[in-house]
UniProtKB/Swiss-Prot annotation:
GO biological process: 'de novo' UMP biosynthetic process; glutamine metabolic process; L-arginine biosynthetic process
Binding residues for ATP 2: 716, 755, 757, 762, 787-790, 830, 842
One Gene Ontology cellular component annotation held by this UniProt entry: cytoplasm
Protein name from the UniProt record: Carbamoyl phosphate synthase large chain
């Protein structure tokens, strides 16, 4: 059936900020869908609150609304736009839940908007645990024994009947939020209470724990004519009990017999029909009992998901794009396969390689989080690798993670471990379990014993055993001969099993460079194979490659002039989707200039790894060895390392030493900015102030510096991204503890000590430079005071409290620095303003995480311009104009993962903790800030009770101003004794509430009972389980708005005041840009 002509305007809802469980994959699916719908001539209206996405670019839809994904605000947009249809299946759980709310509020009926892609009933049937269970019974499929509970006593009764352990799964939540595994009544009481609270309909499923069963997923698509295709099967390396987002996964499934696969395939087709997903993709999860083969259906997502992004990248089948076309009435046999151009989408993809996905965790940022993996997702990103064998793909994936490993061990990072530790690490799922399987095999543990401890299928353990045995063989050879003397076939086998040159260098006690030289001398070169959806039965038209060691190279060089762009690797805290955004913009911009673009990246969630973003895509780890192999195969004009965050910069020097040409700002200039001593010299020469500082190599040196410049000081290791291991230190005792710890982690790296400017205002600038001229992209004022990491602070553009003189000084310093560093492309500079004086904190001559936000707020596409400058264009000829004055105000706010990480203190500091960001835009700071907070999931109350408890140094005039404002706005104030005395002495009425240590009912009881609407609690700086910690943690767990800095509270009170007195404006980003 051809496309529908009765609908003209379609609204697409994005997934909002990046959180654990919902990451860049939805930018990828949303962008693909917008492109597909516009290709078909539909008018597209997009709503999403995340400015760091490609989908919110003004070019992606006819009208883009960067507004909170809040039902009332989306209802206003629907009223303004009156779309014919709403497509909610591409924005993750967020969009699905919004579609359900809008339907139930009657908004869709009122404006005659039809849900396409998935009907309301189908969403309900798949997401409501009770309805899903009934549907499975109806079609004769087995499900785990389970029952639905709406309160804790019901949950306990059900579990008693089923027997422990049980899995708790809340309805309508994402990434297992609020869920968990309970082994006894106490644990169940806690998990069920949390789960019921977090579920949109206050419902949890208590399910028989099918722990240790094998877990499989099928990616399925269906059209209106009831054609169903299976795109891909995915097998979880980790058994049931670990959330699939936290499991290592493998595609296609490796350990199913043909009969079992056919059974799952038939079951999946029955399920998608019964649930009634008329069009588009669904992800269906099964558990299979390892001994008796009993199969149970676990759950289904009636939408594009994290797994569908993986399935798309693994097979080359563009699920999101095709889902969008199916939603408007096409059938699968009418849509051509984009990669081959001659087969229709109704051909099921076949693959002749193995794909391995490994999650990336952020436990280094959250040392107090529980690191055992369970049914609630904890990873923040993932990598994918492709190889001809499981062993090769596994080692490449480990190398892609950027956790300092170059494969499965023998890379100079192995630890001495006891059998005791090994058993512990095998029994409890954790991020490094795969390394411990290797240790266990090396110590002689049998495959069967490892299986008993881990329930990981013996097939996988056998493959790891192959690596262990081969490594042993290599080590024996290395005792007898040098790498030069090793027979070629042994080296070839090592490369076929995925060993990196770095690993071989460790085994043969030589350097990576030497291994590379010998390998090439023996004629061992990598070849590239194509991902073409059809095992090479048809010719692929859009090339997408992976490396392996075979004979025939399928990536033949073209004659065009070409540029290579290095991506950002896996998402993690400190380096997220913002950098992918910059890479994609660079690709678009260079295509305009007539270059062939070559993208190198290993993150399956992103737009940069979409088969039709760049001209050629290499799905490879971003390491010196892998990048140089591609460079030699393609021989481009040069490589761009400015856009992928720290990842490409870490290998830039090595690439240059190996003969690659780095485009844009030179490696040496980057080094000046990163190297504290060289940078300080430069600032002195330019006569630009910076905070007093020193560099310590030992504890004694550190104490001496601190005495000289005076506490408080900011201490940190050199060369970091996202402020790893930074701390503000107020006394010598804390300094001693910090330095000792830091020297243990990296003894050879010096430690930087800066005078910490308390209460300074931080300001951040993104600018463009072509070596001769500088154009300021945007000046942002941070809302949180200095000491909160710039990635975690909210910021506002244009600045609201800086005077002309300060702004002119900042502009002047920015120009001087960019020219002195010979920047070609982008530079980001961070300043602190204190008592009217401007200090430079740091400069990064690369794309920063604020580039997308600034581009969205001003309408100047910074990354696109920067890419042209690197290719030799000048700002003058491109006609780029500064827009420092805007009619509107944009606020960027950070989004945090605390809800998914119990035990972590939700307090802001110099170490970055946020996973994503949102933007609020309006004509007034208060309204823009309110929208940003709402978009980040914090709905500021307009009435009710405010609890205030602050540390000693915050008991000042600002606090009094704040409290008076809250009183004027009609709030009741409650406070603990110290803060209350201070308020009352200054004539502000406040009621006393007990501290936790003073008895009951205390502040915790009030939070749990829902008697507090807003919490303002500034931390005392002590570590550990303080009362403040317990209050802040309760705020997160019970969903109460909470603020941990006075500056944040000042902004919040302005926002509340603004919303009570003025109306919020709802306008598309295109309209804002036209006005400025």
């Amino acid at each position: 059936m051809p496309k529908r002509e009765d609908i003209r305007k379609i609204m697409v809802i994005g997934s909002g900020p990046i959180v654990i469980g919902q990451a860049a994959e939805f930018d990828y699916s949303g962008s693909q869908a917008c492109k597909a719908l516009r290709e078909e001539g539909y008018e597209v209206v997009l709503v999403n609150s995340n400015p760091a996405t490609i989908m919110t670019d003004p070019e992606m839809a006819d009208r883009v609304y960067i507004e909170p994904l809040d039902a009332e605000i989306v209802a206003k947009i629907i009223e303004r736009e009156t779309p014919d249809a709403l497509l909610p299946t591409l924005g993750g759980q967020t969009a699905l839940n919004l579609a359900v709310q809008l339907t139930e509020m009657g908004v869709l009926d009122k404006y005659g908007v039809e849900l396409i892609g998935a009907k309301f009933e189908a969403i309900k049937k798949a997401e409501d645990r009770e309805l899903f269970k009934e549907a499975m019974r109806k079609i004769g499929l087995d499900v785990p024994k389970s029952d639905v509970a709406h309160d804790v006593s019901e949950a306990l009764a059900i579990a008693d009947e089923i027997g422990y352990p049980v899995v708790v799964r809340p309805a309508f939540t994402l990434g297992g939020t609020g869920g968990g595994i309970a082994y006894n009544r106490e644990e169940l009481r806690e998990i069920a209470e949390r789960g019921i609270k977090m579920s949109m309909i206050n419902q949890v499923l208590i399910e028989e724990g099918v722990l240790g069963w094998k877990e499989f997923e099928l990616e399925v698509m269906r059209d209106l004519a009831d054609n169903v295709v299976i795109i891909c099967s995915i097998e979880n390396f980790d058994p049931m009990g670990v959330h699939t987002g936290d499991s290592i996964t493998v595609a296609p499934a490796q350990t199913l017999t043909d009969v079992e696969y056919q059974y799952l395939r038939d079951a999946a087709i029955k399920i998608i029909r019964e649930i009634g997903v008329e069009t588009g993709g669904s992800n269906i999860q099964f558990a299979v009992h390892p001994e008796n083969g009993r199969v149970v259906a676990i759950e289904m997502n009636p939408r594009v998901s994290r797994s569908s992004a993986l399935a798309s990248k693994a097979t080359g089948f563009p699920i999101a794009k095709i889902a969008a076309k199916l939603a408007v009435g096409y059938t699968l046999d009418e849509i051509p396969n984009d990669i081959t151009k001659e087969t229709p989408a109704s051909f099921e993809p076949t693959i002749d390689y193995v794909v391995v996905k490994i999650p990336r965790f952020a436990f280094d940022k959250f040392p107090t989080a529980n690191q055992v993996l369970g049914s609630q997702m904890k990873s923040v990103g993932e990598v994918m690798a492709v190889g001809r064998t499981f062993e090769e793909a596994l080692q490449k994936a480990i190398r892609s993670l950027e956790i300092g490993r170059y494969g499965l061990g023998c890379d100079g990072k192995d630890k001495e471990v006891t059998m005791e530790e090994i058993r512990e690490r095998l029994r409890y799922p954790n991020a490094s379990r795969v390394f411990y399987i290797r240790y266990a095999l090396q110590k002689g543990m049998s495959v069967n014993e490892i299986y008993e401890l881990t329930k990981i299928d013996p097939w996988f353990i056998d493959k790891i055993k192959n690596l262990v045995e081969f490594e042993e063989q290599l080590k024996q050879i290395a005792e007898r001969m040098s790498i030069e003397e090793v027979p070629k076939e042994i080296l070839k086998k090592a490369k076929e099993l995925g060993y990196s040159d770095r690993q071989l260098a460790v085994i043969f006690n030589t350097t990576e460079r030497e291994v590379r030289r010998v390998r090439k001398g023996k004629g061992l070169r990598v070849v590239y194979k194509m991902v073409d959806t059809c095992a090479a039965e048809f010719e692929a038209k859009t090339p997408y490659y992976y490396s392996t060691y075979e004979d025939e190279n399928e990536a033949l060089r073209s004659e065009r002039k070409k540029v290579m762009i290095l991506g950002a690797g896996p998402n993690r805290i400190g380096q997220g989707i913002e950098f992918d955004y910059c890479c994609v913009h660079a690709v678009f911009s260079l295509k305009d200039e007539g270059y062939e673009t070559i993208m190198v990246n290993c993150n399956p969630e992103t737009v940069s790894t979409d088969y039709d973003t760049s001209d050629r895509l290499y799905f490879e780890p971003i390491t010196h060895e892998d990048v140089m192999n591609i460079y030699e195969n393609e021989q481009p004009e040069g490589v761009i390392v400015q856009f992928g965050g720290q990842t490409p910069l870490n290998i830039a020097r090595e690439l240059e030493d190996s003969g690659a040409r780095i485009l844009g700002t030179s490696v040496d200039s980057i080094d000046i900015a990163e190297d504290r001593e060289r940078f300080a010299e430069l600032l002195e020469r330019l006569n630009i102030p910076q905070p007093e500082n020193g560099i310590a190599h030992s504890l004694e040196e550190a104490k001496e510096i601190a005495r000289k410049i005076g506490f408080p000081v900011l201490v940190r290791p050199s060369y970091v991204l996202g402020g790893r291991a930074m701390e503000i230190v107020y006394d010598e005792e804390t300094l001693e503890r910090y330095i000792t710890e830091a020297l243990e982690v990296s003894p050879e790296k010096p430690i930087l000590i800066d005078k910490f400017l308390e209460d300074a205002i931080e300001v951040e600038v993104d600018a463009l430079c072509d070596g001769e001229e500088v154009v300021i992209g945007g000046i942002m004022e941070h809302i949180e005071e200095a000491g909160v990491h710039s990635g975690d602070s909210a910021c506002v553009l244009p600045p609201v409290s800086l005077d002309e003189v300060t702004i002119n000084t900042i502009v002047d310093y920015t120009r001087k620095l960019a020219l002195a560093l010979n920047v070609v492309g982008l530079i980001n500079i961070q300043y602190a303003v204190k008592d009217g004086k401007v200090y430079v904190l740091e400069a990064n001559p690369r794309a920063s995480r604020t580039v997308p936000f600034v581009s969205k707020a001003t309408g100047i596409p910074l990354a696109k311009i920067a890419a042209k400058l690197m290719m030799g264009k000048k700002l003058r000829e491109l006609g780029v104009k500064e827009k420092l004055k805007l009619k509107h105000v944009a606020v960027k706010e950070a989004v945090f993962p605390f809800i998914k990480l119990p035990g972590v203190d939700p307090v802001l500091g110099p170490e970055m903790k946020s996973t994503g960001e949102v933007m609020g835009i309006d004509y007034d700071f208060g309204l823009a800030y309110y929208k940003a907070e709402l978009a980040a999931g914090m709905k500021l109350p307009l009435k009710g009770t405010v609890f205030i408890s602050v540390r000693r140094k915050d008991k000042n005039d600002r606090l009094l101003y704040l409290a008076r404002k809250f009183k004027e706005l009609g709030f009741r104030i409650i406070a603990t004794d110290g803060t209350r005395d201070f308020l009352v002495q200054n004539g502000i009425e406040a009621d006393l509430i007990l501290k936790i240590s003073q008895g009951r009912p205390n502040i915790l009881d009030a939070i749990v009972n829902g008697q507090v609407d807003l919490i303002i609690n500034t931390p005392s700086g002590k570590r550990g389980r303080t009362e403040g910690y317990m209050i802040r943690r309760a705020a997160v767990d019970y969903g109460v708005a909470h603020i941990t800095t006075l500056a944040g509270a000042m902004a919040a009170v302005r926002a509340i005041e603004a919303v009570k007195s003025r109306k919020m404006v709802v306008k598309s980003i295109q309209e804002y840009h036209e006005e400025s």
